[in-house]
Amino acid sequence: MLELEHIQKSFDGVPVLKDISLQVADGEIVSILGPSGCGKTTLLNLILGIVDADSGRICYDGQDLTRTPMEKRGFNIVFQDYALFPNLNVLQNITYGLRNKPGISTKEEVEELIDLLGLREHLSKRIDQLSGGQKQRVALARTMVMKPKILLLDEPLSALDGVIKESIKDRIKTIAREYHLTTIIVTHDPEEALTLSDRVLIIEQGTISQYAKPEEI
């Protein structure tokens, strides 16, 4: 379980997050919803460890991670722009992180992810030969081979349309279910949050407005 207790964060003296407390259960999909500038991306970055809280605690499975550096938390993120390597093909992108941690996923586990995300026919392609939805699937596969404790997604569907968006939503749900993986998503789209998530966290002006199941929002 991920627990945030009384998290506060300011930039240049301006409060961005104010007394944020919440719990996210193992295997749960939670969307952080709110307008631009409300603090949702800052909250994602605090969980990941890119920035530190001014006060409060971040705990995972009972361990205090508040001052634990990002690389030791075991959480991974898929950024909005995918951050793929243009000079590498799809397979090389997926397995890039295994260069430094070769034993973290077996060849069979990598192959399973490739099939789960429908990337088998694209493995030898360059990144510039892929559609937006295909790039998103490559970014998901690259993150998943590292076996994150928590998967963080920053606006994963914002650049996608129609059928492609629904396909990626289904794959995110499948990943969370198959791997019992806690998944936290930042979005500005209410429909996306309500149809993708087990619970939705609505932030307004740096505070929690609602945190509930979609049917209760």
What role is predicted for each listed range?
Residues 33-35:
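The feature captures the beta-strand-to-loop junction immediately N-terminal to the Walker
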Residues 64-79, 100:
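ABC ATPase NBD coupling module
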Residues 105-122, 173-174:
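Conserved ABC ATPase "signature" region
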Residues 126-130, 134:
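Conserved ABC ATPase signature
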Residues 145-149:
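A short, proline-enriched helix->beta-strand linker immediately N-terminal to the Walker B motif
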Residues 211-212:
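ABC ATPase "signature
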